[in-house]
UniProtKB/Swiss-Prot annotation:
Role played: Required for disulfide bond formation in some proteins.
Family: Belongs to the DsbB family. BdbC subfamily.
Single GO biological process annotation from the record: protein folding
PANTHER family associated with the record: DISULFIDE FORMATION PROTEIN-RELATED, SPBETA PROPHAGE-DERIVED DISULFIDE BOND FORMATION PROTEIN B
Main location: membrane
Name of the molecule in the record: Probable disulfide formation protein C 1
Gene from which this protein is expressed: bdbC1
Cellular compartment(s): Cell membrane
Amino acid sequence: MGREKKQEYALFTAWGASFIATLGSLYFSEIMKFEPCVLCWYQRIFMYPFVLWLGIAVVKKDYRIANYSLPIASIGACISLYHYAIQKIAAFSAAGAACGRVPCTGEYINWFGFVTIPFLALIGFITIAVCSFIVIKNK
């Protein structure tokens, strides 16, 4: 497979991950009525713009977006990882209780005993970061 096709597929995959993450986030808050905590809002701030940015980049085949999406997705992943640690690691749990009106330790979902909303966001950010790295690597 050619370099440009790899870049195209990676960029589209990153956009798809951001689109699914945004739809999932809106589903949980607007349909299921789960109120987001402060850290959830920060994750949304980092995730939602990717739908527009990466969507435009896919249409224009502008692979330079990866230079910006990689660090932004990495920061979002760090926030998600910290939030997940607050939920799952006892030593971090004390920090989550004073997070805001809705405690960051709350687990609206807990599929298979480990898949929570911050974990899903983490997977989305990692997917975007890896795809961005692939785009950069194949320049």
